[in-house]
């Protein structure tokens, strides 16, 4: 799995989640099918693949400034591109949509949240995560990590 696959997976899964939120009664089958196909298309062989690439990007971002780090800089550049291309993000506030620094920071924060889920649960099961976890659970993980 490469950097582009991770970014596409993270953003597209948000798009799938957004599309299915309005139809809660029909979410499970449609959502599972779409997400399973997305995992296959992204060539994710195992949860370990996801953990390795997330750790590499986060380490790269934390060890030096983003402009000096090719891996983190490449991740942010691609995240910005795909973030702006995804359908439901076209409707966000213009001041947010045009703020590249804010969107780049969102990309790093998103990776950190995924990393916390992996660390908390051992193996990260992406299809289970998107069915049972919510924003409040992510916030609790961050608060728990910060209090250690």
From Swiss-Prot:
Predominant localisation class: plastid
GO CC aspect terms: chloroplast
UniProt-annotated location(s): Plastid, Chloroplast
Keywords: Chloroplast, Plastid
Name of this protein: Uncharacterized protein ORF148
Organism for this UniProt entry: Porphyra purpurea (Red seaweed)
Taxonomic lineage from the root: Eukaryota, Rhodophyta, Bangiophyceae, Bangiales, Bangiaceae
């Amino acid at each position: 799995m490469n950097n582009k696959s991770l970014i596409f997976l993270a953003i597209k899964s948000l798009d799938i989640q957004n599309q299915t939120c309005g139809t809660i009664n029909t979410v499970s089958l449609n959502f599972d099918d779409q997400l399973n196909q997305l995992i296959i298309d992204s060539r994710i062989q195992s949860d370990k693949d996801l953990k390795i690439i997330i750790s590499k990007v986060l380490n790269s971002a934390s060890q030096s400034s983003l402009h000096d780090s090719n891996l983190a800089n490449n991740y942010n550049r691609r995240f910005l591109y795909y973030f702006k291309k995804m359908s439901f993000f076209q409707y966000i506030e213009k001041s947010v949509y045009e703020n590249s620094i804010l969107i780049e920071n969102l990309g790093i924060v998103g990776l950190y949240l995924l990393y916390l889920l992996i660390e908390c649960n051992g193996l990260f099961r992406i299809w289970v995560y998107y069915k049972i976890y919510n924003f409040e659970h992510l916030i609790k993980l961050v608060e728990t990590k910060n209090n250690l």
